[in-house]
Amino acid sequence: MENETKQTNTNEQEPDIFAQKLREADSLYAILSGCTKEPYVYCDPETMDDAILLFTDEEGAKAGAQKLAEQQIPVGIAKVDRKSLLLFYTSLYTMGVNAIQVHVGEEQKMIQLTEFVRRKDPEDSKNGKVWVENPELHLTMLYYMQDLRRQPNQEITPELNDLQEEIGAHFTKGRYIVPLPEEGNGIPLVKLKSGDIFQPIFTDVIEFQRFNREKKFRPVVVDAIKLAQVLPEEAKGIVLNPLGVNMPLTVQKVKKQPEAPVQKPVSVEAQIDAAIREVQAEAGRE
């Protein structure tokens, strides 16, 4: 996939120029999906990259959003300030995105995420801490919800069925962050428009941080196979990343086992700080 991208760039200097703009911009503008509240993702038909759209100017972003809207794709734009860029780029890794289509004026280039911002393998840098990420699941959910919510009462197509199967396969292999209150009893619950109650869980620390801005909750890590054991009685299932892709999944409840192992807490701030330090260090070496 990386070789294919390099072949499209006849001038070897160009990717560096575009990557430099990504690093040094005071602000950038991202196209957001109206279906997921996250960056709009698409699969490039030529390179098969899973990419997002970034613009260096607001007018260009508005024009790009208008083109998508004309295709009945609900989108908006979001300004990303310089101080938030590193965390924004780090979040692309957790989303499963591997490339950015960068628009500078009338020019555009597909830039691989690893060409301008790199990080070490979390498995090599967690220092005994529990590191939670589910990029394949997160990406598949984004594609699924972008399509499913595109039109009201849309029928389930064969393509959506395939994505559902992929989501199920990825989900059962993962481990997730479950929020518990710092003080007192009770587990946070989310009430959907249907009136059904779901327990929020998160694919990664960045999604948990969005939910826990007031720091009322502490995170614990639970494997997918054990989620049914910790599901509150009143909850119909779980909802993944409620402030983002917001995907509910019904979970078949099982009798809680008192001998179940204690869930280990994960340090959210430490993991985000570590990810940012690694990104800064790698960018400084280039």
Regions found by a protein language model. Give the residues of each.
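An interfacial alpha-helical scaffold signature
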Residues: M1-E286
